Structure formats: structure tokens, C-alpha cells
């Protein structure tokens, strides 16, 4: 049985999937509140930048992976319009349910699907844009997921990965203090769940840095891969094109 990491802990691959599922079942109901608290609302700006870079137009087909509460899905669905096709997907039933309900509450009628990014249930060359926001670091086989994202993207289409990344060195000390002390405290105080937010901090540190992820996307077969550092590298948006 192969080993992988769950935060800083070494676990069996099958065990990681169960542990990650447990984290997101736990945080689903407070997910948006905690995002606002943890990022001081900055996650909205990061997502807005991603939406602008996606440049979704009427009639586009878009796959939103690990879509959670549906922030990106909502904007993509509005941009694609009635002639488009936007899929709200997540591997976690609790997150999918919360996102689906919130989309419906906002008048967004678009399909929601339980979906494993390592085994995407769509044909080759189907989507104009494939996105994953704050989900790749939780996947056991990131290389397989990136290859699947490329497979279902049309020639000329784009794969976009918005994810926590490696902060600039001058920010590192303060960022570590915030991540390992403040985040678990916020999780405990507002969600009664310090452990899930401790995992968040650890999973960010274990995620590939900007250049490593760029190389992984290239190895998955994507071309013209580039990235933008946001908020001093706290987050990076990677983009790759399928030729």
C-alpha cells in the first residue's frame, strides 16, 4: 500500500481520502464564514481575478472542480448564459449539497455532480474552461487529476488552478505564526473545530510551490503554462492551455 501525506502526517493513500472527506464534512456549514475570517475577505478578490482570467463567454462549457459552495460556479454560469453549460462538482457530498443549495437560493440553476477529479466522468475535449480553486492540494494523485483536467479540455481551452502557494520570504515568519497559531484558534472559536484548520495550514505547506506546480502542469501535457502570485504568494493562479 502506498503512502502519502495528510498535512504533516504520513498515511496510507486510502486513509487520506477518508481523512480529507472528514475535514470537509466538518467544515461545510461554516465554510464561507471561515473563508472570510481567515483571509480577511481576500478570497473574494482572488476568485474575482480568476473569473476575469477565465474570460468565460456565452455558450462556453465550464467544469468547476472542487467547487464547494459555488462562488466560481455562480459567476461562470452567469457569464456562460442559457446557451452555456457549467458544472458544479465536488468529491465531498456535504460541500456539494451546501453549494447546490446556495446556488439555487441565488437563482442559479446549473447541474451539480459528485465528481472525483482523478476520474472525471466526461468525454475528451468537452470543456472550454476547467477550474479548480483551493482543491488540488487535497488530492492524493495531483498528477492524475491534472492529466484528467487536460483530457476533458477542448483544444484551445484552458485549465486554471487557484491554490495556496509559497509566500515571499519577507512574509514567511508572520505567515507561519498566523497559519499555525491564529488559524486553529479561529477554527476553534467560530467553528468549534481547531483540527480541521490545523490541517489546512499543514496541507498548504505540503503543496508544491509555484514553479513545481508549473512543471507538473507541463508534464500533464498543458502548454503555455504561467502563474500569477497574489497577495505576496499566499495564493497563486496557474493557467495552462491545451493545444
From Swiss-Prot:
Keywords: Menaquinone biosynthesis, Methyltransferase, S-adenosyl-L-methionine, Transferase, Ubiquinone biosynthesis
Domain of life: Bacteria
Role description: Methyltransferase required for the conversion of demethylmenaquinol (DMKH2) to menaquinol (MKH2) and the conversion of 2-polyprenyl-6-methoxy-1,4-benzoquinol (DDMQH2) to 2-polyprenyl-3-methyl-6-methoxy-1,4-benzoquinol (DMQH2).
Annotated binding of S-adenosyl-L-methionine, by residue: 69, 90, 116-117
Swiss-Prot/TrEMBL GO biological process terms: aerobic respiration; menaquinone biosynthetic process; methylation
Protein family (similarity comment): Belongs to the class I-like SAM-binding methyltransferase superfamily. MenG/UbiE family.
Stated name of the protein: Ubiquinone/menaquinone biosynthesis C-methyltransferase UbiE
Single Gene Ontology MF annotation: demethylmenaquinone methyltransferase activity
Enzyme Commission number(s): 2.1.1.163, 2.1.1.201
Catalytic activity: a 2-demethylmenaquinol + S-adenosyl-L-methionine = a menaquinol + S-adenosyl-L-homocysteine + H(+); a 2-methoxy-6-(all-trans-polyprenyl)benzene-1,4-diol + S-adenosyl-L-methionine = a 5-methoxy-2-methyl-3-(all-trans-polyprenyl)benzene-1,4-diol + S-adenosyl-L-homocysteine + H(+)
Keyword flag Transferase: yes
Metabolic or biological pathway: Quinol/quinone metabolism; menaquinone biosynthesis; menaquinol from 1,4-dihydroxy-2-naphthoate: step 2/2; Cofactor biosynthesis; ubiquinone biosynthesis
Amino acid at each position: 500500500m502506498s503512502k502519502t501525506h495528510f498535512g504533516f502526517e504520513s498515511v496510507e493513500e486510502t486513509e487520506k481520502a477518508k481523512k480529507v472527506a472528514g475535514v470537509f464534512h466538518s467544515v461545510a456549514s461554516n465554510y464561507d464564514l471561515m473563508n472570510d475570517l481567515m483571509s480577511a475577505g481576500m478570497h473574494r478578490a482572488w476568485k474575482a481575478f480568476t473569473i476575469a482570467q477565465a474570460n468565460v463567454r456565452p455558450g462556453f462549457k465550464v467544469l468547476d472542480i472542487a467547487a464547494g459552495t459555488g462562488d466560481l460556479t455562480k459567476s461562470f454560469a452567469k457569464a456562460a448564459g442559457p446557451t452555456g453549460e457549467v458544472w458544479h462538482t465536488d468529491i465531498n457530498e456535504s460541500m456539494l449539497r451546501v453549494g447546490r443549495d446556495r446556488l439555487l437560493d441565488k437563482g442559479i440553476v446549473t447541474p451539480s455532480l459528485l465528481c472525483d477529479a482523478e476520474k472525471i466522468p466526461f468525454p475528451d475535449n468537452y470543456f472550454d474552461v476547467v477550474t479548480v480553486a483551493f482543491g488540488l492540494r487535497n488530492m492524493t494523485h495531483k498528477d492524475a487529476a491534472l492529466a484528467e483536467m487536460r483530457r476533458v479540455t477542448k483544444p484551445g481551452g484552458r485549465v486554471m488552478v487557484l491554490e495556496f502557494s509559497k509566500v515571499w520570504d519577507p512574509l514567511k515568519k508572520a505567515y507561519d505564526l498566523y497559519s499555525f497559531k491564529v488559524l486553529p484558534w479561529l477554527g476553534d472559536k467560530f467553528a468549534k473545530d481547531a483540527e480541521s484548520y490545523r490541517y489546512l495550514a499543514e496541507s498548504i505547506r505540503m503543496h508544491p510551490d509555484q514553479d513545481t506546480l508549473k512543471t507538473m502542469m507541463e508534464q500533464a501535457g498543458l502548454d503555455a503554462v504561467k502563474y500569477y502570485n497574489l497577495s505576496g504568494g499566499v495564493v497563486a493562479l496557474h493557467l495552462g492551455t491545451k493545444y
